[in-house]
Amino acid sequence: MLPLLAALLAAACQLPPAHGGATDAPGLAGTPPNASANASFTNEHSTPRLLASAASAPPERSGPEEAPAAPCNISVQRQMLSSLLVRWGRPRGLQCDLLLFSTNAHGRAFFAAAFHRVGPPLLIEHLGLAAGGAQQDLRLCVGCGWVRGRLRAPAGAPTALPAYPAAEPGPLWLQGEPRHFCCLDFSLEELQGEPGWRLNRKPIESTLVACFMTLVIVVWSVAALIWPVPIIAGFLPNGMEQRRTTAGAPAAAPAAVPAGTTAAAAAAAAAAAAAAAAVTSGVAPK
């Protein structure tokens, strides 16, 4: 019995105190033996609280960049043989970048163009055309951002400002701006049937020259139909003789005397002749 009692007393002396003591007092030197257990117990109690608070908090409203992507509101019209007119919706953003490149060159862009910070409508001139009139497929991508300017959000879109991370100070070219690109694939041959396609439209100078030449041709044609008739008739021999006889006949013909005055004229002429004879006979005897 004594050895068993001694073993029980030795085991009881080695057990730590259950309550109080220096090990439970906060701020005292030394680490309690059950510090890891207390830390894990504290974490187990704090984790459900964090999860509960996160679940109860309302979800934050996302900005325009997190909203579901709207369909591409891009339209392309062909103005002339080598120019395109591009339009897109303003709600896509204020500052937009536009990329245009060909896609049917087996990985190489036969034509590529980039426009930085532009707005609709945009006229793209001097468009590169494939040699030989081959079919040319193009891809047009418009990327817009809301960082440097915002317009009124479209109907149904969230009104809260997007929570962008604070940009670090530095040059503007180092501060990235989110861009949301929307691409449109099309072919130049497909644009011929659109209302905006006017392949035969020419510059104003060519139009004026064409109108002037048309007017000259019409006037010359009318003159050619009218003028040759009298000109040709005037240079013919019969026409020349007829004109000469017609011009000389009025000058050679004597003055016409009326029929009623013939007898009076003859009597007057006879009286004049008798008077002349009497004067002559009277003067001769003297």
Swiss-Prot record:
For whether the record's keyword set contains Transmembrane, the answer is: yes
Q: Which GO terms describe its cellular component?
A: membrane
Subcellular localization, as worded in the UniProt entry = Membrane
Signal peptide boundaries = 1-20
Stated membrane topology is: Multi-pass membrane protein
Which segments cross the bilayer? 215-235, 263-283
Q: Which residues are glycosylated?
A: N73
Please describe the post-translational modifications of this protein.
N-glycosylated.
- Summary of the tissues where the protein is detected: Ubiquitously expressed. Brain is the major site of expression.
What does the UniProt record say this protein does? Receptor for brain injury-derived neurotrophic peptide (BINP), a synthetic 13-mer peptide.
* Family stated for the protein in its record: Belongs to the TMEM158 family.
What is the protein name for this chain? Transmembrane protein 158
- In its UniProt entry, the species of origin is given as Mus musculus
